Amino acid sequence: MIEYLAVLIYFLFSLALASLIIFLSFIFAPQKPDPEKISAYECGFDPFDDARGKFDIRFYLVAILFIIFDLEVTFLFPWAVTLGKIGFFGFWTMMAFLIILTIGFIYEWKKGALEWE
């Protein structure tokens, strides 16, 4: 337990500092909303429509796929660096992970989740 004391202190200090910064920003920041400040900003143009419009579900699917494959890359880099030390067990564990991701990708492809009709 004592070996995690530094991590606990760091976590508590970070939490206290973040809370202090947020609290001070509410105290010292001017709170004067006007129509220009609370309106949606669209690259200098007047807003064409409500900023909270509906999105097509395919955008969310693409975002989720991006997150999944981005996480795959974050797992692959440390695995590639330590491949010599982790041996066959680490190799086959990552191969199983990649096979599961590939099966999921093929399933989504066959279901038409990547089609933009």
Swiss-Prot record:
GO terms for molecular function: NADH dehydrogenase (ubiquinone) activity. It is a multi-pass membrane protein. Pfam families: Oxidored_q4. The keyword NAD applies. Keywords: Electron transport, Membrane, Mitochondrion, NAD, Respiratory chain, Translocase, Transmembrane, Transmembrane helix, Transport, Ubiquinone. InterPro entries: NAD(P)H_OxRDtase_bac/plastid, NADH_UbQ/plastoQ_OxRdtase_su3, NDAH_ubi_oxred_su3_sf. It catalyses: a ubiquinone + NADH + 5 H(+)(in) = a ubiquinol + NAD(+) + 4 H(+)(out). It is an enzyme of class 7 (translocase). One of its GO terms (cellular component) is NADH dehydrogenase complex. Its main location: mitochondrion. The chain crosses the membrane at residues 8-28, 61-81, 86-106. It is found in: Mitochondrion membrane. Its EC number is 7.1.1.2. Core subunit of the mitochondrial membrane respiratory chain NADH dehydrogenase (Complex I) that is believed to belong to the minimal assembly required for catalysis. Complex I functions in the transfer of electrons from NADH to the respiratory chain. The immediate electron acceptor for the enzyme is believed to be ubiquinone. Belongs to the complex I subunit 3 family. This is NADH-ubiquinone oxidoreductase chain 3. It comes from Tetraselmis subcordiformis (Marine green alga).
